[in-house]
Amino acid sequence: MSQLILGIESSCDETGVALVRAGEGGAVPVLLAHALHSQIDMHQAYGGVVPELASRDHIRRVLPLTREVLRESGERLEDVDVVAYTRGPGLAGALLVGAGVACALGAALDKPVLGVHHLEGHLLSPFLSSDPPEFPFVALLVSGGHTQLMRVEGVGRYEILGETIDDAAGEAFDKSAKLMGLGYPGGPALSRLAEQGSATAFKLPRPLLHSGDLDFSFAGLKTAVLTQAKKLGDELTARKADLAASTEAAIVEVLVKKTLAALQKTGLQRVVVAGGVGANRHLRAQLNAACARAKVRVHYPELHLCTDNGAMIAMAAAMRLQAGQQQPNRDYAFDVKPRWPLDAITLAA
C-alpha cells in the first residue's frame, strides 16, 4: 500500500514543502509536487542570514506553500499519511517553525510525524532525478556548512571517509566573495564572475591536497584570498574576475581530487554529489571530465533541488519508511537538533 508523505523544510533561509508518494518494495518514491520560497532578497541588505527574520518568514510562508503543493498535486490534506519535517541541523528558531507546523498538522489530522536529518535529505536528493543512482556509491556532500566524503551502502548506512577540519567549501566561496565585495549570496556571485576571469591568474593554495587522507581544509585558502585582495589594493576592482576564477579553481580542484581518491580507496564506481555547491558549473564540469576518464558514473540532484527544499525531506522520509528503518509516531511534543552529525543516524553494520 502506497503512502502520501508531506515534507517540510525550514532549516535556514528557504521554506520548502513537497508531496511524495512512496510505493511498496524498492520502487523509488515519486515526487508529486513541491514549492519553495527563498529569503535571499530579505537577507541581502544584511549581508547574510538574520536568524530571527528567517524564523518569522518561515511562519508566513509554510502554510501557503502547503496549499500550493496540494493544489498542484490534486491531493487532499486529509489523505496525507505522514508529515515529515527537518529536525536538524540548522538554525534553532527556523527548525522550530517547521517542526511546530508539522506536529500541529499531524495532531489535527491524527497522522504520524517523522523528523528528518537535513543532510540525509541532501544525500538522497539525487534519487529525485530522472537518472537516480544505485547503492553503493561515494558521496560528496558539499554545502555552506558541510563538506564530507562518504561511503554509502544504503539508506542509513553511511561511513564518513573524510570531512573538513575547519571551513566548509561553501563557506570558502561565500567568505571569499564577501572579501571581494560581491554581496550575498556570495558563492553564486563569485562563480558568475569567475566565468570572466583567468583561473591561473593567481597562485592560491590547495590545502590538504596531498595529505594522504580524505579530509578537507579551506581556512588557509580564505586567508590567502584576503592577503591577495589586500595586496591588490586599488587594482582589486580590475582584477576581481581573475581572483574569483583562481579561488573557484582552487576549491574545485581539491573537491575533485579528494573525490577521486575516495573512489580509489573504496573501489566503488559511482559518485553522488549533493548540497548547494553541487550546483556549481565548474565543479560539475571538472568532476564530469575526471569521472569520464576514470570510467565512473556521477549523479547530481536536479539543479533546482540542489538548494534546501521540501522534496528532499519528503524523499528521505519515504526512503527511510520503505526500508523499515524508522517509524513515524504520534508524539507531537517535538524537539529539534541544531547540531546533529550525520553519523548519529547511521545504522550499525
Swiss-Prot record:
Fe cation binds at H118, H122, D308. It catalyses: L-threonylcarbamoyladenylate + adenosine(37) in tRNA = N(6)-L-threonylcarbamoyladenosine(37) in tRNA + AMP + H(+). Binds 1 Fe(2+) ion per subunit. InterPro entries: ATPase_NBD, Gcp-like_dom, KAE1/TsaD, Peptidase_M22_CS, TsaD. CDD domains: ASKHA_NBD_TsaD_bac. One of its GO terms (molecular function) is iron ion binding. SUPFAM superfamilies: Actin-like ATPase domain. It comes from the Bacteria. Pfam families: TsaD. Its cofactor is Fe(2+). The keyword tRNA processing applies. Required for the formation of a threonylcarbamoyl group on adenosine at position 37 (t(6)A37) in tRNAs that read codons beginning with adenine. Is involved in the transfer of the threonylcarbamoyl moiety of threonylcarbamoyl-AMP (TC-AMP) to the N6 group of A37, together with TsaE and TsaB. TsaD likely plays a direct catalytic role in this reaction. This is tRNA N6-adenosine threonylcarbamoyltransferase. The lineage of its organism: Bacteria, Pseudomonadati, Pseudomonadota, Betaproteobacteria, Burkholderiales. The gene is tsaD.
